């Protein structure tokens, strides 16, 4: 399993539908980049300048909204993930 370092978070991105409500197929270059995902793994937290560690606010299993230009795409064991910094997460979905 991927284990993120520091304040990084591994997400399984929730893919968008490939068809519109009217049944029209949307070209891949016309689709918006997904901005929601499920937290798969969380690092140990950010370290401040004074050496203190700030615990992550998100937890494994939570669904989150993140900045659409955030992170790095990673392929691991045939699955695609997104590794982002915790501060690129905008909200937790209840």
UniProtKB/Swiss-Prot annotation:
GO terms for biological process: chaperone cofactor-dependent protein refolding. Coiled coil: none annotated. One of its GO terms (cellular component) is cytoplasm. The keyword Cytoplasm applies. SUPFAM superfamilies: GroES-like. One of its GO terms (molecular function) is protein-folding chaperone binding. The keyword Nuclease does not apply. It is found in: Cytoplasm. CDD domains: cpn10 (cd00320). Pfam families: Cpn10. Gene3D superfamilies: GroES chaperonin (2.30.33.40). Keywords: Chaperone, Cytoplasm. PROSITE patterns: CHAPERONINS_CPN10. Together with the chaperonin GroEL, plays an essential role in assisting protein folding. The GroEL-GroES system forms a nano-cage that allows encapsulation of the non-native substrate proteins and provides a physical environment optimized to promote and accelerate protein folding. GroES binds to the apical surface of the GroEL ring, thereby capping the opening of the GroEL channel. Heptamer of 7 subunits arranged in a ring. Interacts with the chaperonin GroEL. NCBIfam families: PRK00364.1-2, PRK00364.2-2, PRK00364.2-4, PRK00364.2-5. Belongs to the GroES chaperonin family. This is Co-chaperonin GroES. It comes from Ligilactobacillus salivarius (strain UCC118) (Lactobacillus salivarius). The gene is groES.
């Amino acid at each position: 399993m991927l284990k993120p370092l520091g304040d990084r978070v591994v997400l399984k991105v929730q893919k968008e539908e490939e068809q519109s409500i009217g049944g029209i197929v949307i070209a891949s270059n016309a689709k918006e980049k997904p901005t929601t995902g499920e937290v798969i793994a969380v690092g140990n937290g950010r370290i401040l300048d004074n050496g203190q560690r700030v615990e992550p606010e998100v937890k494994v299993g939570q669904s989150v909204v993140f900045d659409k230009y955030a992170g790095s795409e990673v392929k691991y064991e045939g699955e695609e993930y997104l590794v982002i910094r915790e501060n690129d997460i905008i909200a937790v979905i209840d």
